[in-house]
Amino acid sequence: MVYIDHNGRVWEKRPWDWRRIVELFVGIWFAIKQLFLTFLAPFTGNNNQANPRRGNGWGGGGGWGGGGGGGGGGGGGRPGSGSGGLRPNRRIGRIQPTMSCNMPAGGGUG
């Protein structure tokens, strides 16, 4: 692949210079940093409150819609819906054994 450097020279491939080595180590540093930040995210108090697109955490912006079905009803809401924060760790349920899964055979032909 052709590479054009910052001086306008055309190279067959990108040369190994000081800038490329520094970029490589900085990239590795930020990747390791982000990895550990994601490991520690549940234990920190920062819940991305400064991000205006995400609201405030786990759906703290509006309550859960209520009613529905036959006649509607008022918009219910969870208790403490404006608090934000992380949800508690809950068990989803047990993993079903393979024999109870309803899926087609390998080819999907019937």
UniProtKB/Swiss-Prot annotation:
Tell me what gene encodes this. Answer: SelG
Q: Which residues cross the membrane?
A: 21-41
Q: Which residues lie on this side of the membrane: Cytoplasmic?
A: 42-110
Q: Which GO terms describe its cellular component?
A: endoplasmic reticulum membrane; Golgi apparatus; Golgi membrane; intracellular membrane-bounded organelle
Intervals, Lumenal compartment: 1-20
InterPro entries assigned to the protein according to its UniProt record, in alphabetical order: Se_SelK/SelG
Identify the stretch(es) annotated as Disordered: 51-110
Organism for this UniProt entry: Drosophila melanogaster
Q: Give the UniProt subcellular location, in the record's own words.
A: Golgi apparatus membrane
- What does the record say about its membrane topology? Single-pass type III membrane protein
Q: What is its main location?
A: Golgi
Its function, per the record, reads: Plays a role in the life span. May be involved in regulating the redox state of the cell and possesses anticarcinogenic properties.
The annotated regions of Gly residues compositional bias extend over 56-85
UniProtKB keywords: Developmental protein, Golgi apparatus, Membrane, Selenocysteine, Signal-anchor, Transmembrane, Transmembrane helix
| Listed name of the protein | Glycine-rich selenoprotein
User: Single Gene Ontology BP term?
Assistant: embryo development ending in birth or egg hatching
